Amino acid sequence: MAEGQVLVLDGRGHLLGRLAAIVAKQVLLGRKVVVVRCEGINISGNFYRNKLKYLAFLRKRMNTNPSRGPYHFRAPSRIFWRTVRGMLPHKTKRGQAALERLKVFDGIPPPYDKKKRMVVPAALKVVRLKPTRKFAYLGRLAHEVGWKYQAVTATLEEKRKEKAKIHYRKKKQLMRLRKQAEKNIEKKIGKFTEVLKTHGFLV
């Protein structure tokens, strides 16, 4: 990957810990990483057990002054961010710099809605979990422990998908017209095409 290039990952369908481990390694190596659709991240194990674990974590606080921490994030993006932070030496300068190279989002906000998103096969739920194993959605867990924007994120995602469908339809139409135009002019420019091919400009 070129220096300064941003790696945009789609979190949907990935396992929380596995994706976090890979992201942590990449940011330590100096790459900028953006993770979108964090609400679609999966956690292995059934939902009820995961919820009990998170509720137990919510009870961890400083008795004399809870505002001093630990801080319990409710948004899926922040839960994922905290998971990555736990895999970094975040109290050192190197770890802090690595953490600054990571951006996390619920849904797919602009400008990332127009960028190509990648997946990490080593962290995909369909690759890593047996089909019979239970799993939970991070978005649902977050919603049940206090995240208020599940409905808003879902609405914005629907709007984005509709826009993407329209854009894809237009793109297909343009490609069809281009092919037709090439066919129409093929006989006229045939000899020029042959010359370009002999010189290696066309394959």
UniProtKB/Swiss-Prot annotation:
The modification Phosphoserine is found at residue 77. Its main location: cytoplasm. Keywords: Acetylation, Citrullination, Cytoplasm, Phosphoprotein, Ribonucleoprotein, Ribosomal protein, Translation regulation. The modification N6-acetyllysine is found at residue 191. The modification Citrulline is found at residues 59, 140. One of its GO terms (molecular function) is mRNA binding. The keyword Magnesium does not apply. NCBIfam families: L13_A_E. Associated with ribosomes but is not required for canonical ribosome function and has extra-ribosomal functions. Component of the GAIT (gamma interferon-activated inhibitor of translation) complex which mediates interferon-gamma-induced transcript-selective translation inhibition in inflammation processes. Upon interferon-gamma activation and subsequent phosphorylation dissociates from the ribosome and assembles into the GAIT complex which binds to stem loop-containing GAIT elements in the 3'-UTR of diverse inflammatory mRNAs (such as ceruplasmin) and suppresses their translation. Component of the 60S ribosome. Component of the GAIT complex. Interacts with EIF4G1. HAMAP family: Ribosomal_uL13. This is Large ribosomal subunit protein uL13.
